């Protein structure tokens, strides 16, 4: 079953539609913000707030939540949701003149372009779209069309971006899918696949290092950009492992605020810094460039078996 409308839809129409699109339901979530719930025939689910095109939940068929969202997160216009998968565009972090991580993650102008489901055993998709406006052009003077596709399967979640340059000048930007992976205790987690890579350590002013560990562990604050990272990484912890497969995004960011700074973070609950590790696919080390009329496509897939827990190696 498929729904598509080129002009996008506003909340009243979406609520009226929700009973007719089968496995994508649109409703009102926290903070009275519109939210889409994707349900796969296997029982897997995902939750996407239209505010920021923000994935806030992913549960494969085993029903276990794989993403972390803070209990103190703010759900309000102009605010970023703390956790899930924020879309950082057209700037990563403070690497430029725009607000931290750009405007996409706090925009309320995302529109539902289409929903679809392929029947038993297939996939459930939600496509959102954000275009330039007077507000975006005031801070980033470019014409663009950004599509974000969320695809749910029984044991995986894909998030894909397509950026079309709708203007007459080249676009340059940095970006990331700022994924907060849930972990029972960050100190017991390990990321596999980073050995041998060069990285920038932003806890030391961007100092350059080479990763020597086969399994990277986090004991406190970590803020690293791994350059030219492989497309397949794995998070191992006291639970089912999660694999991240990225597409057309060169870098990987590893981030946790650490206990010392967490106390000053108003939208992070007490002790919650120990319950996540950000493993982010991105174009961070150097800007991407899209010529007029061209389209850039990239994305990632998170997958997790529903087998017995894995333990860090």
Enumerate the language-model features and the residues they cover.
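Extended, loop-rich substrate-binding clefts of extracytoplasmic carbohydrate-active enzymes
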Residues: 25, 30, 99-154
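Acidic-aromatic substrate-binding/catalytic surfaces of carbohydrate-active enzymes
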Residues: 41-100
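Asparagine-centered strand-capping/turn motif at beta-strand->loop junctions
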Residues: 161-167, 304
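Short, Lys/Arg-enriched N-terminal segments with co-localized hydrophobic residues
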Residues: 1-8
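Beta-strand/loop-rich accessory regions of lumenal/periplasmic or secreted enzymes
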Residues: 78-105, 192-201, 205, 213-214, ...
